[in-house]
Amino acid sequence: MNNNILVFDQVSNLNEPPNILLLSEEDHRVAKNAEIFIDKMITNLKFLSNSNSCDSSKKRKMIEQKTKCSNPRKNCGAKKLKTSPLPQPMTNLSHNHMFSIDEKPKRGRPPKPKPLCCQICLTNNTPYWRWSVIENNKIRVCNRCGQKIFKLEKSINEQLLFRIEIINLLNKIDDEKPIEK
């Protein structure tokens, strides 16, 4: 037997009636778990984005205290973990990227160009690169995929031309028939 639960949404405008949803117990449980998960993620993000929340030296001391043995005379097997620098808070949040981190330009040689890659079969070894238009988007494809696309387009065009010719012939035949009275 499936029991249903009435759920009232929060009202943002006092002039509007609240939204009422009829959910099964399982859907209600899933929705509650999702709300709890989202709330936890928001609090974690607020903590991580707050640069004044805790100094990195304090964090290192906390890590060292957790790894030290409680009795200094006994070696109870607790090993000191290597402490690596903790991640810095996110800065330069731009509207184009959800999370962008400041990057320093590298000195010396310019970066190597990325190898070309076929956007259909993902190969990067071909004697000839082609451009193909798929759904109004121009994409770079390898020679093999480009030839396959060309053959498909050619066969489709031939079929369309053949159908148009048949339709024209049928129309001519209909036009040539004398009208019987």
Curated annotation (Swiss-Prot):
GO-annotated biological processes: regulation of DNA-templated transcription
UniProt organism field: Dictyostelium discoideum (Social amoeba)
Positions of GATA-type zinc fingers: 118-145
Entry keywords, A to Z: Metal-binding, Zinc, Zinc-finger
Name this protein carries in UniProt: GATA zinc finger domain-containing protein 22
One Gene Ontology term of the molecular function aspect: zinc ion binding
Annotated gene: gtaV
InterPro entries for the chain: Znf_NHR/GATA
